[in-house]
């Protein structure tokens, strides 16, 4: 008799039970690992699968996390073979070529499209009913690419979009007002990144419109220069990349925030990238961030945000820029 047999006596033969809320992270780079640890520490799933083409790096990261299993409640698995991801509820795609210092997010695009041509069909093969969350940049275009390559309905393909831009925005407004970001309600919509649109008309604290108190807020004529905050939001990522080489922690937390809303069916409203054709005067098939309701089925509803004419024009301009790139892509 083995030690195990002496220690434990079987009462019944266990039937294999699939994971009820499995999450997969594709890509074990800085963003993938920050997303993984954020998901683990929020205890969102009973199984976390990780997949990457870089076998040694993947194996090392998985082992490193598994060594902390005592402190977690989640089973952690990893393999370069996508069968490890089977039956995932949510699949988070962070893989792709990394943005270099000074490189625009749009520049990355065709490099990442080619990577997606391998990743997306594999996800669909093993998790045909999953909710696909795209984080790789340029996120709006790659969410469109993932939607096209997957054949999924639009409500099951979501881009992390401006969830992080809005978090940065709320943090900086909070700093200026000496308030916690959760008490500063503010939204950034449109493209994630350089042409994102701050909705100054909607910024409020406890329902008090800040533009109601300062009608010039967000404009050139504003003596308090609130406009600089949006510039800081846009430059923030570039600044972090310049200082430490990449961004990871905040986007990882942002991803876990979105995964939580889906897994726990919270019906929370998030600015995420979705198909906006027909909204805010957008005519083309593009994905941009607008406030959306996230739950167990994916993206269930879109909130009709009241935008000023100038804000709407900026969203349309974003859409035109993205469509200009998208129509050149070879899918």
From Swiss-Prot:
Sequence positions that bind substrate: 105, 137, 168, 247
InterPro entries the record matches: L-lactate/malate_DH, L-lactate_DH, L-lactate_DH_AS, Lactate/malate_DH_C, Lactate/malate_DH_N, Lactate_DH/Glyco_Ohase_4_C, NAD(P)-bd_dom_sf
Keywords for the protein's UniProt record, in alphabetical order: Cytoplasm, NAD, Oxidoreductase
Residues given in the record as NAD(+) binding sites: 29-57, 98, 137
Keyword Cell wall biogenesis/degradation: no
The EC number(s) this enzyme carries: 1.1.1.27
PROSITE patterns per the UniProt record, alphabetical: L_LDH
Keyword Cytoplasm: yes
A Pfam family: Ldh_1_C
Active site residues according to the UniProt entry: 192 (proton acceptor)
Localization, UniProt: Cytoplasm
Pathway where it operates: Fermentation; pyruvate fermentation to lactate; (S)-lactate from pyruvate: step 1/1
Any GO BP annotation: lactate metabolic process
GO molecular function, one term: L-lactate dehydrogenase activity
Reactions accelerated catalytically: (S)-lactate + NAD(+) = pyruvate + NADH + H(+)
Function field: Interconverts simultaneously and stereospecifically pyruvate and lactate with concomitant interconversion of NADH and NAD(+).
Family, per entry: Belongs to the LDH/MDH superfamily. LDH family.
NCBIfam families: L-LDH-NAD (TIGR01771)
Subunit structure: Homotetramer.
The protein, known as: L-lactate dehydrogenase A chain
Taxonomic source organism: Notothenia angustata
């Amino acid at each position: 008799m083995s030690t195990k047999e002496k220690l434990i006596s079987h009462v019944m033969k266990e039937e294999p039970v699939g994971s009820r809320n499995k999450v997969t992270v594709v890509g074990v780079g800085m963003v993938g690992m920050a997303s993984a640890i954020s998901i683990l520490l929020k205890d969102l799933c009973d199984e976390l699968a990780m997949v990457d083409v870089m076998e040694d790096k993947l194996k090392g990261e998985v082992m490193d996390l598994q060594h902390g299993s005592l402190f977690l409640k989640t089973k952690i698995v990893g393999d370069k073979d996508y069968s490890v991801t089977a039956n995932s509820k949510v699949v988070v795609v962070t893989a792709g070529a990394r943005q270099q210092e000074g490189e625009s997010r749009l520049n990355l695009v065709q490099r990442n499209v080619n990577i997606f041509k391998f990743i997306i069909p594999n996800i669909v093969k093993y998790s045909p009913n999953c909710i696909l969350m795209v984080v790789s940049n340029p996120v709006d275009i790659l969410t469109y690419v993932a939607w096209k390559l997957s054949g999924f309905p639009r409500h099951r393909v979501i881009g992390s979009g401006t969830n992080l831009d809005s978090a940065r925005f709320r943090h900086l407004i909070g700093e200026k007002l000496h308030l916690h970001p959760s008490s500063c309600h503010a939204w950034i919509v449109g493209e994630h990144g350089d042409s994102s649109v701050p909705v100054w008309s909607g910024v409020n604290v406890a329902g008090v419109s800040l533009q109601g108190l300062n009608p010039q807020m967000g404009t050139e004529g504003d003596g308090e220069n609130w406009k600089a905050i949006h510039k800081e939001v846009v430059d923030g990522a570039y600044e972090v990349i310049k200082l430490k080489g990449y961004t990871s922690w905040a986007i990882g937390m942002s991803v876990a925030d979105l995964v939580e809303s889906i897994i726990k069916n919270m019906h929370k409203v998030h600015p995420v990238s979705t198909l906006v054709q027909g909204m805010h005067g957008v005519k083309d098939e593009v994905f941009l961030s607008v406030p959306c309701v996230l739950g167990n089925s994916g993206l269930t509803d879109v909130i009709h945000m009241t935008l000023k004419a100038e804000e709407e024009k900026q969203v349309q301009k974003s859409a035109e820029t993205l469509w200009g790139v998208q129509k050149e892509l070879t899918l």
